[in-house]
Amino acid sequence: DNVTGVQTCALPIYKKKYKALVGEGSISGCKVILVKPHTYMNLSGDSLREVMDFYKEEFEHLLVIYDDIDIPTGSIRIRKNGSAGTHNGMRSIVRQLGTEEFPRIRIGIGRNSGDLADYVTGGFTKDEVKPLEEAVINAAYAVECMLDKGIDIAMSRYNMVYKLPKG
């Protein structure tokens, strides 16, 4: 949600289409379509498949941004491609598209020892909020950098590991 609100990537979401909320606009002079699936997470691929089919876009023009419990809170990992890992939404996307060959930005939300569903859908602690907000802002700048300078430069500038203070 928040990446679209960062000034560099401010795209209004104005349509309900393809089982998603959709916004269109421009970032760094490139036409961008933002798709926020409105399905259960494990069905995210259904929505994205419809969008890709309608716009007849190539997979290299796709960028998936998602939260990930498998990397530390506040960290960002940009990849050109790769497996879905443990993320059910990404598993759905890979299954529907039939490929892992598309770029993605993972925003780390870390993991806690409680119930996973409660953790992922619940709120974050006071110590987690600031690094997560910074990670979202950096992810937005990474999108702009990818469009301006390419994914390799974005990876070298924005792939980072954030360490929460021990407390």
What residues fall within each predicted segment?
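Single conserved hydrophobic/aromatic residue that forms the stacking wall/gate
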Residues: 1-9
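N-terminal catalytic or cofactor-binding beta/alpha core of small enzyme domains
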Residues: 10-43
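Short secondary-structure boundary/capping segments
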Residues: 14, 24-25, 54, 94, ...
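A short, glycine/Asx- and small/polar-enriched loop/turn
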Residues: 27-32, 72-73, 115-116
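Short phosphate-binding loop-to-helix
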Residues: 31-63, 83-86
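Short acidic/glycine-rich loop or secondary-structure boundary segments that cap or lie
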Residues: 43-44, 71-74
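Catalytic-core elements of nucleic-acid end-processing and repair enzymes
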Residues: 67
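Phosphate-binding/catalytic loops
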Residues: 74-86, 90-167
